[in-house]
């Protein structure tokens, strides 16, 4: 169990924090520990629900880099709820745009981001992407 723990902490870039009390970790570090804990169960699917929403903008990249690594190096399906549109476009095989609890549009990242068909999707992307 200890070897698995150390391997997972290394995977999320926190092996140097193995003796640290959780309260002394930053929000981004705590989120990466949470990801490592989930991976300990060897899941085939992970649900990631707004994993960066409560983080300082300066540490969002730490968490997104862990997800990038998992996406490239592990046979793992990830279902992610996010407002990080650039990141979603970069790593996704399929994207769904939800509004008021309903799927308004879905497709490949290229289809949805570069050529949205639904008017609400167009409005959302215009507002979000122009803000960034």
Task: Please give the residue ranges for each predicted region.
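Conserved ABC ATPase "signature" region
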Residues: 2-16
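Conserved signature/switch motifs of ABC ATPase nucleotide-binding domains
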Residues: 20, 41
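Conserved ABC ATPase signature
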Residues: 21-25, 29
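Catalytic Walker B motif of ABC-type/P-loop ATPase nucleotide-binding domains
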Residues: 46-49
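Helical segment within the ABC ATPase nucleotide-binding domain
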Residues: 61-73
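H-loop/switch region of ABC-family ATPase nucleotide-binding domains
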Residues: 82-83
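ABC ATPase "signature
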Residues: 106-107
């Amino acid at each position: 169990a200890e070897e698995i723990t150390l391997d997972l902490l290394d995977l999320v870039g926190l092996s140097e924090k193995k003796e640290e009390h959780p309260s002394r970790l930053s929000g981004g570090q705590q989120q990466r520990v949470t990801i490592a804990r989930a991976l300990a169960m060897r899941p085939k699917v992970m649900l990631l629900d707004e994993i960066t929403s409560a983080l300082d903008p300066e540490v969002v990249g730490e968490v997104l880099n862990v997800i990038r690594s998992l996406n490239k190096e592990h046979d793992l399906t990830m279902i992610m709820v996010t407002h990080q549109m650039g990141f979603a476009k970069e790593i996704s095989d399929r994207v769904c745009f939800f509004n008021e609890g309903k799927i308004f549009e879905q497709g490949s990242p290229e289809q949805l981001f570069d050529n949205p068909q639904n008017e609400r999707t167009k409005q959302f992307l215009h507002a979000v992407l122009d803000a960034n």
